[in-house]
Amino acid sequence: MVKLDPSSLGLAIFGCAIGMALAALGCGIGQGLGLKGACEGIARNPEASGKIQVALILGLAFIESLAIYALVINLIILFANPFV
């Protein structure tokens, strides 16, 4: 196993923390805007709430998958040492 020097490991950890924070921030904003739009749509047209709900859940799943991809990439950077 090849070891990283402490400064490279620290920078990798810092980069992963910043990357995950930005991914969580973006996903949170996206989910909030999607929920806001769905609530406004249901308030305007209550009869279409079923279709709006299905589209909302599908959209939220796609948004959440971005955070999961960011987590996987961060775990690869932390534990697989791709820089060596």
Swiss-Prot record:
The chain crosses the membrane at residues 9-29, 57-77. The keyword Cell membrane applies. GO terms for cellular component: plasma membrane; proton-transporting ATP synthase complex; proton-transporting two-sector ATPase complex, proton-transporting domain. GO terms for molecular function: lipid binding; proton-transporting ATP synthase activity, rotational mechanism. It is found in: Cell membrane. PANTHER family: ATP SYNTHASE LIPID-BINDING PROTEIN, MITOCHONDRIAL (PTHR10031), ATPASE PROTEIN 9 (PTHR10031:SF0). F(1)F(0) ATP synthase produces ATP from ADP in the presence of a proton or sodium gradient. F-type ATPases consist of two structural domains, F(1) containing the extramembraneous catalytic core and F(0) containing the membrane proton channel, linked together by a central stalk and a peripheral stalk. During catalysis, ATP synthesis in the catalytic domain of F(1) is coupled via a rotary mechanism of the central stalk subunits to proton translocation. Belongs to the ATPase C chain family. This is ATP synthase subunit c. The lineage of its organism: Bacteria, Pseudomonadati, Thermodesulfobacteriota, Desulfovibrionia, Desulfovibrionales. The gene is atpE.
